[in-house]
Amino acid sequence: AHVRFLLLFLYALQGTVADLRAFAFSNRLRDVGPPLETLPFDDAMNLILKEVGGGSTDYGQAWQDLYDQHWPLIDGRTTVLVLGDGRSNMTNPRLDLFGELAARAKRVVWLSPEGEGRWGTGDSALLQYRPFCTHLGHAATAADLERAIDEALSAYG
């Protein structure tokens, strides 16, 4: 349910945010901008889930893929918006790369579908990522997402 919600959010942003680049992953990062830009939502979602879904989440590998394939896209004008729970299934969260990402970007906004009480429990690395985030918040509904993004972006100009 959270995946569909997040993909619908990214789909809605296409065409409304200049220079938007959208990526998704479970264990390997994929550029999902082309299907979101060119296909009806259900078709885009099915294709993205086929290409990306099904694996255990590995944030460390996603940061490595971002570094290897798309790092030049991130600079002092970039807002990085991470929509995810930060659960990396006991894999290396690659705080080194996430820290570099945060240093390169203008800001990093992370919105988790899990409430704050679950952050850092079990396989969650969210509290480890927290120091690198300009804003870390909870967003499980469309209203939460809208409020959290408005707060994060207005607070940091």
Task: List the predicted regions and their residue ranges.
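A short acidic, amphipathic alpha-helical/loop segment
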Residues: 5-9, 94-100, 125
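An amphipathic, basic-hydrophobic helix/alpha-beta surface used to engage anionic
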Residues: 1-19
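Exposed acidic/Ser/Thr-rich ligand/metal-binding surfaces
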Residues: 63-107, 137, 148-156
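Short acidic, Gly/Ser-rich segments with clustered Asp/Glu that frequently serve as metal-coordination loops
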Residues: 1-5, 29, 86-90
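Von Willebrand factor type A / integrin I
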Residues: 99-157
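A short, conserved beta-to-alpha structural element at the edge of catalytic cores
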Residues: 13-35, 104-123
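Active-site proximal loops enriched in glycine and acidic residues that flank catalytic Cys/His/Asp
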Residues: 24-27, 82-84, 91, 112-115, ...
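Von Willebrand factor
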Residues: 30-32, 36, 43-78, 115, ...
